[in-house]
Each structure stands twice: as C-alpha cells, then as structure tokens.
C-alpha cells in the first residue's frame, strides 16, 4: 500500500519500533474536519487559479490513500503546476519507492528546483 520497496518499508518499520511516537495512526476527527474544510476552500472558484507559485505534483494512479483523479483535476486549475504521474509501478510513498520510481522523482524535483529556484 505504501511502497514496492521492501527494504525501505522495513526501514520505516524499524523507525516505528525505535521511535513509536513518529508512527502515524488513523486520522483524528479534528484532522478529518480540517481536511474537509480545506477541500471546501480549494473547491471555491478561483481559489487554485489564484496561486502564482510554481508547484510540482507527484502522484500515482495506484495510490490507495490519495485520489489521483483529484490531483490531476486540481493541477489543471493551477496555472503554474507541473505533474509527474506514475502507474501501478508506484504506491503512495514515491520517495520511498523502488529506485526506478524514486530516481525519476528526484530527477524531476531537481529539474523543477533548478528551473524555479536556481542556485545563486
């Protein structure tokens, strides 16, 4: 559900054992209410269209936690958005994925930052 890379997932499990306070559990009702309030704000006409900051959205159609259809739809409302969408080769945690996916993500992030926030 989170990654296809067993070693990276086991690393995460090891951190949870070492530091149980960093493990996320299910969302609280407050979290759900705040998430819904945020969604309502973003659904307002003009809300996303007003964003001037360049944004890179990374997603996968195989994500079982995030709606990729919504990511793609919202990216079309963002005037300065770029997307990188994976298929079944990637799960939710793209930066903890198998090297092929992770490397593509990092390369795209580097290129995006070089374009929009170049080093002095």
Q: How would you describe each model-predicted region?
A:
Residues 1-49, 53:
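Alpha/beta-hydrolase
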Residues 53, 67-76:
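Short alpha-helix in the alpha/beta-hydrolase fold that links the catalytic acid
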Residues 51, 57-59, 63:
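Short beta-strand/loop motif that positions the catalytic acidic residue
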Residues 49-52, 76-78, 87-88:
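A structural signal for short secondary-structure junctions
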Residues 34-37, 73, 104, 108-111:
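Alpha-helical elements of Rossmann-like donor-binding domains used by nucleotide-donor carbohydrate transfer enzymes
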Residues 56-58, 84-85:
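Hydrophobic/aromatic beta-strand patches that form the interior of the parallel beta-sheet core
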Residues 81-120:
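Catalytic active-site module of serine/aspartate enzymes centered on a nucleophile-bearing elbow/loop
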Residues 66-67, 97:
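Short glycine/threonine-rich loop-to-helix capping motif typified by GTGT followed
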